[in-house]
């Protein structure tokens, strides 16, 4: 999440890879598998990523009837999309992750945990230039949770790219108002303690 917001995370991915490599064929949880795969991909562990993708495809082929849809429609395309994102192939990432997104809930995890995949998908859409799809997602997010400054900032950036200056400025203003409100609330809470 930090990298998606422009923060340099240094060698943290490489540090994680040490713990992730032994889990390439584990498959105890599809939810964990896709996280492991993304960590390996971000660490640049190409051979481990290739091995894990093949192992995930094999696991999908052996899925029991009740889990076939999860593996075929969510896990495999999501894993390939995450690998593509880490490799910088944003069009492939956007396409494959887009296939998986409708099935994401069946993967498990909390809403906040699954939101990471939504953020990566949105990043892929934006960086691939699929602005209409990115805009639709951001507008839906804004309707669902209108008080999130980060969504307003993302909308502002996209509106700027689309040449919609008036909408961009409005979104920037709303983001700043929300951020100011949150900072004041934190200050008041700190003073009360």
Regions found by a protein language model. Give the residues of each.
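Helix-coil-helix junctions within alpha-helical repeat/solenoid scaffolds
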Residues: 1-193
């Amino acid at each position: 999440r930090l990298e998606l917001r422009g923060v340099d995370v240094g060698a943290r991915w490489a540090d994680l890879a040490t713990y992730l490599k032994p889990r390439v064929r584990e498959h105890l949880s599809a939810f964990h598998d896709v996280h492991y795969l993304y960590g390996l991909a971000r660490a640049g562990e190409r051979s481990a990523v290739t091995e894990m993708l093949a192992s995930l495809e094999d696991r999908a082929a052996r899925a029991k009837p009740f889990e076939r849809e999860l593996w075929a429609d969510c896990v495999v395309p999501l894993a390939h999309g995450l690998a593509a994102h880490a490799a910088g192939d944003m069009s492939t990432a956007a396409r494959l992750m887009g296939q998986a997104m409708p099935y994401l809930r069946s993967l498990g995890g909390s809403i906040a945990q699954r939101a990471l995949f939504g953020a990566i998908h949105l990043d892929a859409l934006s960086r691939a230039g699929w602005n209409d799809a990115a805009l639709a997602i951001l507008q839906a997010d804004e309707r669902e949770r209108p008080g999130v400054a980060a969504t307003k900032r993302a909308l502002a950036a996209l509106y700027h790219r689309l040449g919609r200056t008036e909408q961009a400025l409005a979104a920037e203003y709303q983001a700043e108002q929300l951020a100011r409100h949150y900072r004041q609330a934190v200050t008041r809470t700190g003073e009360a303690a």
